Amino acid sequence: MSGMHAQGDLPIPNITHIEQPYHWDHALPGESRDDFGIRAAGWLEEKILAIGPEKVAAFIGEPVQGAGGVIIPPETYWPEIQRIVDKYGILLISDEVICAFGRLGHWFAYEKFGYKPDLVTFAKGVTSGYIPLGGVMVGNRVADVLIEKGGEFNHGYTYSGHPVACAVALANLNLMEKEDLPRRVREDTGPYLAQKFEALKAHALVGDAQTCGFVGGLVLIKNKSTRAMFDSELGVGMRCRAHCFKNGLIMRAVGDRMIISPPLIMTRAQIDEMMVLINRCLDATLSDLQEAGHCA
């Protein structure tokens, strides 16, 4: 996220971060995903103790990091995060602007990973992106305090409760429920996409490829055996993105990670079509790099 942080006056005082739970990049030799998930969650406890538990109000995180490159945590990560925040009486905020409303095969991503947040932020998928709308869901732990201690909560936005946006959201959610899209992603098209993405690991340019529901990401790598990365100045991700656009494929470049977030209504046949284009663009990118002498 450093590229985005550089565009604003960040870091913000009194907000600190921990490392992302990315097994491929941060695991110790021979460390399983489950063991790594526990260790990665432990970074939060280390940070809490370094700051002082009495000074930490909340931990906020995306169930699956989206704009940071589609970083999919091990199954053990979020339950351990839950244990840690409960231990120190810290609020847990689930940032589900990307992950909610079927994206991971559930209405909300915290259902998939088995934790209970105190607050949930959402946007994007609530209207399927047809019109802007966002919101915050507040759990009893927070709501009860607001009711008992604060009376009215005088906070809002200029466009809160916009009738057109809310009407679109209701129509969208009714359609998603009618077509049972979260279940379809969870039981059918999501596993099919995962199978196809797994096959991308055989490509000479791909170091890792993963999906979770209907988000996916792959990392472009210079040498598979040594895991050597390309020089960032080469802009390999942007080169790949250019080939994607030329071939009618939308993939986002996050450094040298290529990520997708396809429509929830995508069929298996359309997934096959997308995978053909992804492989074609990877081949074209590899050819460019080989011709320029940047890889074997």
Task: Provide a role label for each language-model segment.
Residues 1-296:
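Conserved N-terminal phosphate-binding loop of PLP-dependent enzymes in the Aspartate aminotransferase
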